[in-house]
Amino acid sequence: MSNIKLIVGLANPGAQYERTRHNAGAWYVEELARVCGATLTLDSKYFGMTARVTLHGKDVRLLIPTTFMNLSGKSVGALANFFRIAPEEILVAHDELDMPPGVAKFKLGGGHGGHNGLKDIIAKLANDKGFYRLRIGIGHPGDKSQVSNYVLSKASPTDQELMDAAVDEAVRSTEVLFNQDMAKAMHRLHSFKA
């Protein structure tokens, strides 16, 4: 059984960013909410869109920060502190440049890898890096100087289809995580390739 009490999907707010690669984490939380029959609603106390769901008998909070990506920790910290949720009880879904579209992987801990959303969350959790991550592959533009424009742009229809398939599989693997355990969820998700 999972000890996860908070699932976060990182994104930038606003319609202009809605389907950009950087918002892949939010796509996952939106799909998880839909599958659970929940509606994400704006909660200014936590600087984000929130929902409460039950996954295999466990009470879990969903959160999509409505701050900009580099201020995601403000939202995550506010909700985690209020409900006394420890870093190891948090799963943060985010876009991952170092994996191709169609791939998603669970991971425990680690650095921020240059991801500004993760960097701010780590800072707001008192530099505790011990939270779980769901890395959703978006691919790399090939040149470091193009990364900012790349993550803030929409994917090609082919890449979007691959990313959507990975998000769907991540949601199914989340069911395994809560019904069984992280090892089985990792095995299922890490074996998937769209």
Curated annotation (Swiss-Prot):
Q: What is its EC number?
A: 3.1.1.29
Name the source's superkingdom: Bacteria
According to UniProt, residues marked as the site described as Stabilizes the basic form of H active site to accept a proton are 95
Positions marked as site (Discriminates between blocked and unblocked aminoacyl-tRNA):
12
Binding of tRNA occurs at: 17, 68, 70, 116
Which keywords label this protein? Cytoplasm, Hydrolase, RNA-binding, tRNA-binding
Is the keyword Hydrolase assigned to this protein? Answer: yes
As for subcellular location, the record says: Cytoplasm
The transmembrane segments are none
Q: What InterPro entries does the entry give? A: Pept_tRNA_hydro, Pept_tRNA_hydro_CS, Pept_tRNA_hydro_sf
Q: Active site located where?
A: 22 (proton acceptor)
Task: Give the protein family.
Answer: Belongs to the PTH family.
Q: How does it assemble?
A: Monomer.
Give the function comment from the record: Hydrolyzes ribosome-free peptidyl-tRNAs (with 1 or more amino acids incorporated), which drop off the ribosome during protein synthesis, or as a result of ribosome stalling.
* Record's protein name: Peptidyl-tRNA hydrolase
**Lineage, please?**
Bacteria, Pseudomonadati, Pseudomonadota, Gammaproteobacteria, Alteromonadales
Gene for this chain: pth
